[in-house]
């Protein structure tokens, strides 16, 4: 039946004035340099090469172009089901995943802690096996990276990290797609991180050098990134000929930066530390004073939700802010992740420059 549906849709034409627009979602021509990601887990970007990450971004651009700009219908995930496990609340991760998976013809199933609590009423091993028998993939937004690792070990289907205490890889894919669209290429850009040494920063550290991007990090004392992740990032920088610097001075990190990036100072689960953290992060607000020492073509990113103490309105709502396209690209990148892990689809759009 699916083959018959594809045949009908491939041959169908929608009248557009005197022309016909063909809705075509075939897999396209085989690519000699095609990256094979089908069946993989996406737990952290440290497990992926630069070419593999670029492939996911290429696929993101392809889906965005074909669906948003050309108006094509691509039921690439028809007959597929996605389990969505959320221990932490979410707006963008949930909305982008649910709408994106459904737009591609799949069925997302959302589960909160009221429905499932990893490792509490049932062992993670048993949960992984049940999910594997009923869904084609799982996206999990959890407190502990170790839960994700065990889930992936015991499951026979792809597990995707929707956020953990250590990493947030799907956010970084959206960031990189946004920067590629704006600058035309990622190689040679300097990223300036000003804020907490958190999961977003960790994911940047595991991937930026693979694109030839430099990274300048400023965090308050006591809020530096995980030492083991810093060590790996230093090795990536050495292998790729890029620069990595860590400081406690926000202006030093912003100096010459093409992209100013910050995030929440108080992540979910850290509410009791609010007073202490607000005091520690004094002087870390991104303002036009910060931007003054950045590169002339500076832009700004924030994964949201945003608080005024992290970045002032002048920067956040300025024409230099890429926050809105960054948020939208969460949808196209998670769609690309699911398509790459669950299908043999090949992008038809010409490969962007990275």
Swiss-Prot record:
Pathway where this protein functions: Nitrogen metabolism; urea cycle; L-citrulline from L-ornithine and carbamoyl phosphate: step 1/1
Keyword annotations of the record: Acetylation, Amino-acid biosynthesis, Arginine biosynthesis, Mitochondrion, Phosphoprotein, Transferase, Transit peptide, Urea cycle
Free-text activity regulation comment from the record: Negatively regulated by lysine acetylation.
Cited Gene3D superfamilies: Aspartate/ornithine carbamoyltransferase
Keyword Transferase: yes
A single GO BP: L-arginine biosynthetic process
EC code: 2.1.3.3
Any one GO MF annotation of this record: ornithine carbamoyltransferase activity
Subunit and interaction comment: Homotrimer.
Protein name: Ornithine transcarbamylase, mitochondrial
Naturally occurring in which organism (per UniProt): Bos taurus (Bovine)
């Amino acid at each position: 039946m699916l083959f018959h549906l594809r045949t009908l849709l491939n041959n169908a034409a929608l009248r557009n004035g005197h022309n016909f627009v063909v809705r075509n979602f075939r897999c396209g021509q085989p690519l000699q340099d095609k990256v094979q990601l089908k069946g993989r887990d996406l737990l952290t970007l440290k497990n992926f090469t630069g070419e593999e990450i670029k492939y996911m971004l290429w696929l993101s651009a392809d889906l965005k172009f074909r669906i948003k700009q050309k108006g094509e219908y691509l039921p690439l995930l028809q007959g597929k089901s996605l389990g969505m496990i959320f221990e932490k609340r979410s707006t963008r991760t949930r909305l982008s995943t649910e709408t994106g998976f459904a737009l591609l013809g799949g069925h997302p199933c959302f589960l909160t802690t009221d429905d499932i609590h990893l490792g509490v009423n049932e062992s993670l091993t048993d949960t992984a096996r049940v999910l594997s028998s009923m869904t084609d993939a799982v996206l999990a937004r959890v407190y502990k990276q170790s839960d994700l690792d065990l889930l992936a070990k015991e499951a026979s289907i792809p597990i995707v990290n929707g956020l953990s205490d250590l990493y947030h890889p799907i956010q970084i894919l959206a960031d990189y797609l946004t920067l590629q669209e704006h600058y035309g290429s990622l190689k040679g850009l300097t990223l300036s991180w000003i804020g907490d040494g958190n999961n977003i920063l960790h994911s940047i550290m595991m991937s930026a050098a693979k694109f030839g991007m430099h990274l300048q990090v400023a965090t308050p004392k006591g809020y530096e990134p995980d030492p083991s992740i810093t060590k790996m990032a230093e090795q990536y920088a050495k292998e790729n000929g890029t620069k990595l610097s860590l400081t406690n001075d926000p202006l030093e990190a912003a100096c010459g930066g093409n992209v100013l990036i910050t995030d929440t100072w108080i992540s979910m689960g850290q509410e009791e530390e609010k007073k202490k953290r607000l005091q520690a992060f004094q002087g870390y607000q991104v303002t036009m004073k910060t931007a003054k020492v950045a590169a002339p073509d500076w832009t700004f990113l924030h994964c949201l939700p945003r608080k005024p103490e992290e970045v002032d309105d002048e920067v956040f709502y300025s024409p230099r802010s890429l926050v809105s396209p960054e948020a939208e690209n969460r949808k196209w990148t998670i769609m690309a992740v699911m398509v790459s892990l669950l299908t043999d689809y090949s992008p038809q759009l010409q490969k962007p420059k990275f």
